Amino acid sequence: MSNTTLHATTIYAVRHNGKAAMAGDGQVTLGQQVIMKQTARKVRRLYEGKVLAGFAGSVADAFTLFEKFETKLQQFSGNLERAAVELAQEWRGDKQLRQLEAMLIVMDKDAILVVSGTGEVIAPDDDLIAIGSGGNYALSAGRALKHHASHLSAEEMAYESLKVAADICVFTNDNIVVETL
């Protein structure tokens, strides 16, 4: 990403004990040195509140993808997988979309999917996933919590996983927003 690109950082999603939660931090960074905003909201409810979506990457690019994904959700009556696959196909086939520098996590009560910057749709094996600069930290923390602290709720796991990422990654802050289904 260029030094003048605004980008956002860490999103984590988990399904646990019949509940789903997605967490995102609030930091938006300009280039590699300047924090432009600390209270951005990168996790959103879509399709009558039945779908959660979160982004990491270029803010402008992510909003473009949000809009396109929401259109696909409406077109396919809230079918998450179909909407994600159709978005990915459009993403791969459109020269302008292929230039976008963002990733999405989308989820409903039944599935979690990552729509990657190359137009791939990936379903995690273990009902949790993270993206962005702090994604590996959040994913590691989330796996540990899921395996060794299964008494926690999905919401608590999402929050604590993001908190660990914020403690380690300079591009992730602790202004954490968690949405649940």
From Swiss-Prot:
Protein origin, superkingdom: Bacteria
UniProt-listed Pfam families: Proteasome (PF00227)
Enzyme class name: hydrolase
UniProt keyword terms in alphabetical order: Allosteric enzyme, Cytoplasm, Hydrolase, Metal-binding, Protease, Sodium, Stress response, Threonine protease
BP-aspect Gene Ontology terms: proteolysis involved in protein catabolic process
Regulation: Allosterically activated by HslU binding.
Residues annotated as the enzyme's active site: 9
Protein's UniProt keywords contain Protease: yes
Keyword Hydrolase listed: yes
EC number(s) given by UniProt: 3.4.25.2
InterPro entries: ATP-dep_Prtase_HsIV_su (IPR022281), Ntn_hydrolases_N (IPR029055), Proteasome_sua/b (IPR001353), Proteasome_suB-type (IPR023333)
Stretch forming the signal peptide: none
GO CC list: HslUV protease complex; proteasome core complex
CDD domains membership: protease_HslV
GO molecular function, one term: threonine-type endopeptidase activity
Entry binding sites for Na(+): 166, 169, 172
Localisation: Cytoplasm
Reactions this protein catalyses: ATP-dependent cleavage of peptide bonds with broad specificity
Family: Belongs to the peptidase T1B family. HslV subfamily.
Protein task: Protease subunit of a proteasome-like degradation complex believed to be a general protein degrading machinery.
Assembly mode: A double ring-shaped homohexamer of HslV is capped on each side by a ring-shaped HslU homohexamer. The assembly of the HslU/HslV complex is dependent on binding of ATP.
Protein name per UniProt: ATP-dependent protease subunit HslV
Encoding gene per record: hslV
